[in-house]
From Swiss-Prot:
Family: Belongs to the YeeT/YkfH/YpjJ family.
Upper lineage: Bacteria, Pseudomonadati, Pseudomonadota, Gammaproteobacteria, Enterobacterales
Source species, domain of life: Bacteria
Encoding gene per record: ykfH
Protein name: Uncharacterized protein YkfH
């Protein structure tokens, strides 16, 4: 499975009314200035996960990337 854009992920989310948004993993990744640095990268397949996208977040230590998933679970 590849990381897709948040826009495409939200389209998938709206197409499946029973789907929910969860964190794909608990890790934080260094932010590299644009979501384009993450789009297209491979991530392991997990049953029930429809899509994975990268989201920029910020805490007191600065910006970081969080991988979010659209799931059917």
């Amino acid at each position: 499975m590849k990381i897709i854009s948040k826009r495409r992920a939200m389209t998938i989310y709206r197409q499946h009314p029973e789907s929910r948004i969860f964190r794909y993993c608990t890790g934080k990744y260094q932010w590299h200035g644009s979501v384009c640095h993450y789009t297209g990268r491979d991530v392991p397949d997990i049953a029930g996960v429809l899509a994975v996208y990268a989201e920029r977040r910020q805490d007191r230590n600065g910006p970081y990337t969080c991988l979010m998933s659209i799931t059917l679970n």
